């Protein structure tokens, strides 16, 4: 694990953070001018009403920071390309969702089936290329036990479930100032350790880049938030987690590393089903 560590990982975190810190002061006023502000329903809590009009789509700077830092400091392997593809694919879905809600004033954004179709396509492409070109197997690794089980074609179903579950979990957590970005910083640092353990240095660089971008974003997103990441950021960051879980064969470890997201999702499910 220590042998796999190199300074490019630290530089990637620093570079991603600098991109976010440099872009933020210019992007946030532009989002204000374009009226890319978040709408808060009138029946919501008074504390949330103050957030009405706060620019959203701040995830643009996070994704930009991660992408630039990864391309500079990581070798552009198929694994890195797939990781970026998962993130950028969900970034596009999130951007379209935010644009429809904020600019076109259609509160529901993309239809659920449209999002699911996009995620289904991303999952199939990643799984097919991963299995055929990176040595990705259809085995599932059980954490702590260390056993692997070949689940055959059902692995495609698992990948789709991981993508949809993880991205929506991060999306649900993006309701409080700094919560999603802070939780993602912790989770990405955890995955950096996982990548180092499995000697996947380039994916570790990608993880460190995510860590740096999320920590820097807290400057603008910590209470009181000057900008929200929006679906643009939350879906993309969910894609980061899901992609790392899939490419390191630690899909089930996501439940632990993304523990806060799991708790938040369960909380929402309990609240919805109890009414």
Language-model-detected regions and their locations in the chain:
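Alpha-helical transmembrane segments
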Residues: 1-30, 62-92, 126, 154-158, ...
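Membrane-interface helix termini and inter-helical loops of multi-pass transporters
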Residues: 1-2, 103, 134-147
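Hydrophobic alpha-helical hairpins/lids featuring a short glycine-rich hinge
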Residues: 76-111, 115-116
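Cytosolic, membrane-interface loops and tails of multi-pass inner-membrane proteins
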Residues: 26-51, 96-108, 269-275
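Short aromatic-rich membrane-water interface segments that cap or initiate transmembrane helices
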Residues: 53, 143-154
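Alpha-helical transmembrane segments and immediately membrane-proximal extracytoplasmic
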Residues: 40-54, 78-79, 202-206
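Mid-bilayer segments of alpha-helical transmembrane spans in multi-pass integral membrane proteins
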Residues: 91-96, 120-132
């Amino acid at each position: 694990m220590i042998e796999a560590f190199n300074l490019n990982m630290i530089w990637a975190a620093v570079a991603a953070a600098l991109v976010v810190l440099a872009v933020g002061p210019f992007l946030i006023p532009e989002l204000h001018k374009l009226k890319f502000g978040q709408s808060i329903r009138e029946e919501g809590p008074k504390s949330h009403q103050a957030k009405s009009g706060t620019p959203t789509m701040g995830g643009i700077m996070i994704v930009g920071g991660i992408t630039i830092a990864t391309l500079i400091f990581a070798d552009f392997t198929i694994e890195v390309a797939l990781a970026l593809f998962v993130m950028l694919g969900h970034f596009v879905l999130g951007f379209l969702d935010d644009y429809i809600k904020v600019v076109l004033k259609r509160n529901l954004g993309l239809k659920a089936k449209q999002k699911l179709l996009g995620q289904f396509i991303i999952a199939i492409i990643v799984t097919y290329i991963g299995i055929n070109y990176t040595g990705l197997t259809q085995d599932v690794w059980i954490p702590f036990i260390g056993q692997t089980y070949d689940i055959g074609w059902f692995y495609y179903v698992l990948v789709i479930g991981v993508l949809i579950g993880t991205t929506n979990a991060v999306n649900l957590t993006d309701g409080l100032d700094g919560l999603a970005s802070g939780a993602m910083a912790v989770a990405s640092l955890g995955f950096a350790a996982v990548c180092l353990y499995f000697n996947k240095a380039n994916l570790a660089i990608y993880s460190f880049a995510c860590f740096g971008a999320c920590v820097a974003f807290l400057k603008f997103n910590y209470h009181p938030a000057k900008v929200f990441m929006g679906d643009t950021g939350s879906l993309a960051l969910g894609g980061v987690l899901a992609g790392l879980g899939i490419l390191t064969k630690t899909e089930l470890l996501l439940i632990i590393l993304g523990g806060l997201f799991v708790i938040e999702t369960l909380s929402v499910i309990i609240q919805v089903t109890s009414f």
